[in-house]
Amino acid sequence: MKRPIYLDYAATTPVDPQVAERMMECLTFDGTFGNAASRSHAYGWQAEEKVEYAREQVANLIKADPREIVWTSGATESDNLALKGVAQFYASKGKHIITSKIEHKAVLDPCRELEEQGFEITYLEPEPQTGLITPEMVKAALRPDTILVSLMMVNNEIGTVTDVAVIGELTRANKTFFHVDAAQAAGKVDIDLSTMKIDLMSFSAHKIYGPKGIGALYVRRSPRVRLKAQIHGGGHERGMRSGTLATHQIVGMGEAFELAGKTMHAEQERIRKLRDKLWNGLQDLEQVFLNGHPTQNVANYLNVSFNFVEGESLMMSLKDAAVSSGSACTSATLEPSYVLRALGLSDELAHSSIRFSFGKYTTEEDIDHVLTITKAAVEKLRELSPLWDMYKEGIDLSTVEWAEH
């Protein structure tokens, strides 16, 4: 079976062969298979050494102290630990939290949970069409009892970049903790936690050619951030996250972060050319709209709405391309993307969107082929659409009164 062209790197990435090789060294009896918490013999010491080296590799990419890296099972757990951990530890200082309507579910769902525990959450509305959350919006929402602001650095559906450096200045001045979900940012944009006033940051390995099931939470040491642990049982990771450390996963994440640091800038440049080529080509079609910010973005994403085409039908027509109509965490539902709805898109436009996301194995030939098949599919589906005919005849569809069924 011929595999389709993979353009869903925002959902997950394949493990880099070099990463897989490093991981294999930590699995079998002749490798580093010991428990990093076993302090009484060489098997444990060797595993601990690998774990600590990986901690340095992750810290180096984001210019942090290795002691500020806490291993988790992924960005979802990191987000949960940051939000619930800070909220529950500092509840006596205030119960107000700020986030936005376009965060990942791994932030929004814990926020709903915290609301049930008596916290008050402000959900910021993004700028229409671009999806920007601006420092001004955050400043207007900050209060003396705001204990936490949680915003993503790069949006996972539209690729818009939030100016977290400036927002960090505002939160620090307000004595408010600032958590940033950087799952889609690491390895794509420069992160310097030695200068940014960010207190907590979530990471995932599988978004940058590392394994699934491993992530990290950066927890600032100075000024110190304290958390209420969410998983108990042994006090690993300085009491913040109990559980035997998965040496092979951790080693894989460290290696992936180191490789990302070496190739990041050249890769962004290469991918931007591919993205621009696809977007420029798609604009030959009528009624095609870019979702997200035209310039303040990372190159790996292109989210496009094709008016008068059902996104699910278009995806089914693109048999040669693996794309999505939203984040992988919500693409199992047929609801329109809540991110695109928050950008002010109509149900119709939100339903007609496709997210193309690019990565290290995407080639120019891939883009040429996907461009050809996408144009053909859109044209074919529009031929079948009575709404398209009405639009072409100059009928303003917003004024049409539809009969009730």
Swiss-Prot record:
Keyword set includes NADP: no
Single annotated GO MF: metal ion binding
Top-level class of the enzyme under EC nomenclature: transferase
Catalytic activity: (sulfur carrier)-H + L-cysteine = (sulfur carrier)-SH + L-alanine
Cofactor(s) required, per the database record: pyridoxal 5'-phosphate
Binding positions ([2Fe-2S] cluster): 329
Active-site residues, record numbering mapped to chain: 329 (cysteine persulfide intermediate)
Compartment(s) where it occurs, according to its Swiss-Prot or TrEMBL record: Cytoplasm
Pathway connected to this protein: Cofactor biosynthesis; iron-sulfur cluster biosynthesis
Pfam families the record matches: Aminotran_5
The protein's assembly and partners: Homodimer. Forms a heterotetramer with IscU, interacts with other sulfur acceptors.
Family: Belongs to the class-V pyridoxal-phosphate-dependent aminotransferase family. NifS/IscS subfamily.
Role of this protein: Master enzyme that delivers sulfur to a number of partners involved in Fe-S cluster assembly, tRNA modification or cofactor biosynthesis. Catalyzes the removal of elemental sulfur atoms from cysteine to produce alanine. Functions as a sulfur delivery protein for Fe-S cluster synthesis onto IscU, an Fe-S scaffold assembly protein, as well as other S acceptor proteins.
Stated name of the protein: Cysteine desulfurase IscS
Organism name: Acinetobacter baumannii (strain SDF)
